[in-house]
Amino acid sequence: MGNSNSKSVKNDKENFEDPNATNFESVSQFKIRNVIGKGSWSTVFVVKHRQTKQRFALKCINKKKHDEHKIKKLRNEVLLLQSLNHPLLCKFYSEFEDETKIYLVTDLMLGGDLRYHISQRKFNESVIRIWMVELVSALIYIHSKGVLHRDVKPDNILLDEKGHCKLADFNVAAKVHTSSSPSKSNMTVGRVGTPVYMAPETLIHAVSYKESDWWSLGITFYECLFQVRPFPNHLLINWIRASEEEKASSADRLSSALHISRDKKLTTISKDARSAVMAFLEMDIKKRLGHSSKKLQTHPFFCSISLETVSKGNLTPIFRPKSGKVYVDPILDLEATF
């Protein structure tokens, strides 16, 4: 989890709680099924609630592997998740714990992540347009709540069984600072996220704004179109690893390398898609697509789809994951222990 000086949001139960949901207080309320995700500090299981028979994702975090600072950040993440409620966010239901583990109950997203799908095949612009407009809706919503995601990338975008894209994994998300100084307001401090998706202002100046999320979406958009990222991995990773003195001496070179306008791949897509990609990957945050929500919603690539329809989850996706297919690595079940 990344560093942040931001305060967590307060729990807004009135806005969050589903009146039809069961109150989850113990892992004994669930039947544990197969593993769908495994990280260095957590394992995610498919579970079925014994009473309602509903299926959920249960993330199990081992307390022994983390110090108090990391556990505190996790609890702040939970508070933030409880304040968000939108059809295109992976819904958070409950958090509880026992002596050794912390458990998070969320929506079960059986369609896999976007990374899996774009690595398997090339998709046309019509499919990608729907993905992007759903993510636009999700980002507009969290930004309206003063939240920056700070790690938008295909790995953190999950598909449900109907093919809807949902923004997930808020482990480095943060509330923006509020300050009487315009230069320090609506931002967070620190190089947080995944280097190859970080915006220039995050890489160079170690700050993030809402526009930084739009840059990351632009990289994701490009990757959906071409199955590769626009900028060399080594360039960005080496920058992160460099000393502050080295960063200062090479900032201009990095800034020059992050210009998308000369990319020949962009000539192979539609004019509207090309315009959107280039606008998301604009160096100047005040000119970047997303700085103005009105310009974003009226952009030619997106304007044919009503954001009101999208924000209610009523858009019908073109691509739908195959029913019954499990988009996870089967070896996970062999490696995981509960």
Swiss-Prot record:
ATP binds at residues 36-44, 59. It is an enzyme of class 2 (transferase). GO terms for molecular function: ATP binding; protein serine kinase activity; protein serine/threonine kinase activity. Its EC number is 2.7.11.1. It comes from the Eukaryota. GO terms for biological process: intracellular signal transduction. Keywords: ATP-binding, Kinase, Nucleotide-binding, Serine/threonine-protein kinase, Transferase. The active site is at residue 151. Pfam families: Pkinase (PF00069). SUPFAM superfamilies: Protein kinase-like (PK-like). It catalyses: L-seryl-[protein] + ATP = O-phospho-L-seryl-[protein] + ADP + H(+); L-threonyl-[protein] + ATP = O-phospho-L-threonyl-[protein] + ADP + H(+). Residues 1-20 are annotated as: Disordered. Transmembrane segments: none annotated. InterPro entries: Kinase-like_dom_sf (IPR011009), Prot_kinase_dom (IPR000719), Protein_kinase_ATP_BS (IPR017441), Ser/Thr_kinase_AS (IPR008271), Ser_Thr_kinase_AGC (IPR050236). Residues 30-302 form the Protein kinase domain. Belongs to the protein kinase superfamily. Ser/Thr protein kinase family. This is Serine/threonine-protein kinase ppk33. It comes from Schizosaccharomyces pombe (strain 972 / ATCC 24843).
